[in-house]
Amino acid sequence: MNNPDEPRLGCVGDASECAGIISRWIDVTTWMPRRHSTEELIEMMEEGIPFREFWVLGDPIIGYLSFNRELSQIMGLYVDFPGFGAGKLLLDKVKRGKNFIQLWSHLANTSAHRFYSREGFSKMELNQSGQDGIPEVRFEWKIIA
């Protein structure tokens, strides 16, 4: 049995719970338009999980982090209950053994920006039209030798 307080590597079978987390986040985030149904999110996650370092937390799952090793980039970090340490646990897990990580965050997501800044990330650049058409900010974290 896994420790629910320790992130574990996720699998395709976790896609439904993780898509639910994103869907609930979209529902309560006024600036984020819904572009995909929960079913479409599940399909996208099922296709993407095998190609990512994919961490989940909790049983049932309360958060996940998707990491692209080739780009050293966090592709998604979502938790059901922000502010209670789940995001930090996931982020700390993916930081292990790495000296550089980057990510894009929606410009309007200022609470995420505060979180990433507290965790040692620096704002690097602005992209006025991210992949979903919403302005984004790129963050970097690196260990300086």
Model-based region annotation:
Residues 15-45, 50:
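Conserved GNAT-fold acetyl-CoA-binding loop/helix
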Residues 4-20:
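A short beta-loop-alpha structural element at the N-terminal edge
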Residues 104-106, 122-138:
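Conserved catalytic-core motifs of GNAT/GCN5-like acyltransferases
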Residues 83-96, 114, 118:
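Conserved acetyl-CoA-binding loop-helix of GNAT-fold acetyltransferases
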Residues 56-69, 73-78:
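Conserved beta-strand in the GNAT
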Residues 96-109:
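Conserved GNAT acetyl-CoA-binding A-motif
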Residues 74-85, 105-106:
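A short, internal acetyl-CoA/4′-phosphopantetheine-binding micro-motif in the GNAT/acyltransferase core
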